[in-house]
Design a protein with these regions (language model features):
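Basic, nucleic-acid-binding surfaces and adjacent catalytic neighborhoods in DNA/RNA-processing proteins
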Residues: 22-36, 53, 142-263
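Short coil/turn linker and secondary-structure boundary residues
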Residues: 2, 39-42, 129-134, 145, ...
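Phosphate/anion-contacting hairpin/loop surfaces
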Residues: 64-162, 167-174
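Gly/Gly-Pro- and Ser/Thr-rich, intrinsically disordered tail segments characteristic of DNA damage-repair
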Residues: 1-110
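Alpha-helical structural motif
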Residues: 3-6, 10, 118, 135, ...
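Glycine-centered flexibility motif
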Residues: 4, 30, 41, 51, ...
Length: 263
């Protein structure tokens, strides 16, 4: 499933190609036909990402909400005459660009009231600007008030939006914090540092499209196997303490960490 940096990149791409233009919308597959008519021919005001969800706001007060889930994929092209085969749930196009969406978990048209309900439920998104520090404070409050392990909290989209398995493992390794530590056992400084580091790493992800987390690799193009400290490195030596990287299940998801230096 794409993590938040990828969805932010999709939103940025949508704004670049479609914002301010009249957008035609249809459903080649047919499953989105009735909802497509509600926004077909409207002007796209803005594409906005919050965590793993994207919101396409149109000038008639309606918004198309999209969650890719595990199987969803976007395809952007400038070749409007070369339509690729496949089960396209919804197609967005203007005079110059086309975007095909396949296999999303959620694709629906909702009004502004429904958008607000969803936004209020979602946790703060580290890829969005936070000049007053309000999103950081929301994160601190949600973590510090919970007895759940921090490894579970970071995957809870109501605590923080956009983090998946890779960033969860890498952020906690960089912070030298055990994924089993209860949220309320962490100091405010520790929680704040988690937020700051997450913002830093996901900013790199938005810019490059890669989830690179090793400090010495952040400014380089790096092959996939060398981008991370612990993710999918189970059984190998820890790059910090020479311990052995472990893998276990936490709330049905694979967890990678080093017991030797995360406490």
């Amino acid at each position: 499933m794409p993590e938040g940096h990828s969805v932010q990149r999709f939103a940025n791409d949508f704004n670049k190609k479609f914002k301010g233009s009249v957008v035609r919308v249809d459903s080649p597959q047919g499953r989105f036909s009735s909802e497509a008519k509600l926004i077909d021919g409207r002007i796209l005001l803005k594409a906005k990402a919050i965590g793993k969800q994207m919101f396409l706001k149109f000038d008639n007060g309606l918004t198309c909400r999209i969650h890719l889930g595990i199987y969803g994929k976007w395809r952007f092209t400038e070749d409007l005459d070369k339509l690729m085969p496949g089960q396209v749930r919804v197609r967005f196009f203007n005079e110059q660009f086309l975007a095909d969406l396949r296999g999303p978990t959620i694709c629906e048209v909702i009004d502004q009231r429904a958008v607000k309900v969803i936004e209020n439920r979602l946790g703060p998104d580290p890829t969005n600007t936070d000049p007053r520090g309000l999103q950081k404070q929301r994160f601190i409050e949600r973590v510090s008030s919970s007895a759940s392990p921090i490894g579970i909290l970071l995957m809870n989209q109501e605590v923080i939006s956009g983090i998946g398995n890779v960033y969860r493992a890498e952020i906690l390794f960089r912070a030298q914090i055990s994924p089993h530590a209860p949220g309320k056992s962490l100091s405010v400084q520790q929680i704040e540092e988690i937020w700051i580091d997450t913002v830093k790493l996901m900013k790199v992800g938005v810019a490059t499209g890669f989830m690179t987390t090793r400090e010495e690799r952040l400014k380089k193009r790096t092959k996939k196997a060398d981008r991370n400290y612990v993710y999918q490195r189970q059984g190998e030596r820890c790059l910090r303490c020479e311990g052995i990287v472990q893998i276990e299940l936490m709330a049905t998801r694979k967890l990678y960490w080093c017991p030797g230096c995360q406490f």
